Amino acid sequence: MKALKFFILVSIGLVLSSCSMEDEINVQEITSKNVIAEIKATGAKGIPFPEGSKATTLGSKDFVKITLPEDVYYVVKDEEGNVSRVSTLGIRCKCLKGAGCSPGTYDGRYFCTAELGACSLCEVHAGLIESLSAKGEQKEVQIVGVMDEREDKFGAYAKRGGFGQIEREKESTIQYGITEDFFKCKEVHEALMELYSAVYRTHYDEEIPDFIKSNSDTIPSDHVYIRASLFGNTVFLPTPKELAIEAGLEMVDDISKIHCTCSQGTGCTKDRVYVVVFCNAGNCSDCTMSK
């Protein structure tokens, strides 16, 4: 079996000509059993490419633009630690050894693979469309999660305010994985604070409790954790027990009962930000949360 090697670099360049012509391309699904086996063995994460995403050329065979469906965003972090969300990324597949590196999708992710030709090392460059450079000047950025606002989940629920509005447990639509930096995204942080404010100010006429502000590893005895979706990512939220009962939500009373499991790659450790318990994906490409 010919080994497939992945090397993924997510980067930001400087300038891409605004006059480039764009033609939609059909990115083929990866079907080779050898390639799929190597993806699973290496834990390669690829680039999120959920259903409804589009790939278009950027005036050069070396560059492809991925456009996510409406209301879906990449959350990225640059070298300076700045976190933001974008709906498009520029992608370039490049063969470093040999020839024949080609793009393909598998399990909702975009890869550059050595499935064809004699390429033994494929490299994926991904960056902000507005700043890709035809000269190759680049600045690295990391994908720290995906935001999905298409359904009535955490973000929409927080804006309306009230646990009675949240639907019973729903599976996340995108399981790419998130890290602690995901919570530094302005839109994620604001939604989380709006949620907590709605719960405590609306129902109890109180400010957000100190145990949340201090990111305590324990919750008060009158609170529980409920499973919810944070922009399409599975998390457990601290919630007053009486509200969870009123809404008919499944409850977990102890963080030790929440588990994170990695089946491909490494990482997927239990973590928390503002007492939101989540699985920190790290380099795991298949990170799942359970109780």
Where are these regions (language model features)?
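Bacterial Sec-dependent N-terminal signal peptides
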Residues: 1-31
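Surface-exposed charge patches in extracellular/virion surface proteins
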Residues: 3, 160, 201, 264, ...
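Prokaryotic Sec-type signal peptides and long signal-anchor helices
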Residues: 10-11, 53, 215, 264
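N-terminal propeptides/leader regions of secreted preproproteins
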Residues: 19-94, 127-257
